[in-house]
From Swiss-Prot:
Organism: Bos taurus
Protein name: Gamma-crystallin A
Residue ranges of the region described as Connecting peptide: 84-88
Single GO MF annotation: structural constituent of eye lens
Family listed: Belongs to the beta/gamma-crystallin family.
BP GO annotations: lens development in camera-type eye; visual perception
InterPro entries noted in UniProt: Beta/Gamma-Crystallin (IPR050252), Beta/gamma_crystallin (IPR001064), G_crystallin-like (IPR011024)
Functional note: Crystallins are the dominant structural components of the vertebrate eye lens.
Coiled coil: none
Domain description: Has a two-domain beta-structure, folded into four very similar Greek key motifs.
Every Beta/gamma crystallin 'Greek key' domain range: 2-40, 41-83, 89-129, 130-172
Amino acid sequence: MGKITFYEDRGFQGHCYQCSSNNCLQQPYFSRCNSIRVDVHSWFVYQRPDYRGHQYMLQRGNYPQYGQWMGFDDSIRSCRLIPQHTGTFRMRIYERDDFRGQMSEITDDCPSLQDRFHLTEVNSVRVLEGSWVIYEMPSYRGRQYLLRPGEYRRYLDWGAMNAKVGSLRRVMDFY
């Protein structure tokens, strides 16, 4: 079972709230989040309720201020435990929506879609095995989006505002 602790103030100070299940941040008294401690597994945290807004992947470790998880502000309103996956990882990315156009199958991390596949946009995705994080920019930078097994017919389905994808990586729990 995963465990994550949210703190109102930087440096793990102020009121805290422990969580071990999805979407546990519905507490009205918890108004801001400036530091996080991830004790077990990997989590995705979201700026807004119901898994919306900016998304951030956090692996086991300490995040003493929101800038450490690339946060834009101190707002975290929902979270999701990323299930452990011990098998193979596989996804198919498509250059156009509804699984049309050039298709590339990926089984490992890719720091630059441009260098590897000559792509800067991905419009649809089929995640066949494992969970993945796609990043807006190369080298795992920019906005992040969690893709779990399933079909994403257009970039809006994974919460993006455009089809720009620079890199992607498998969600692996190393602890």
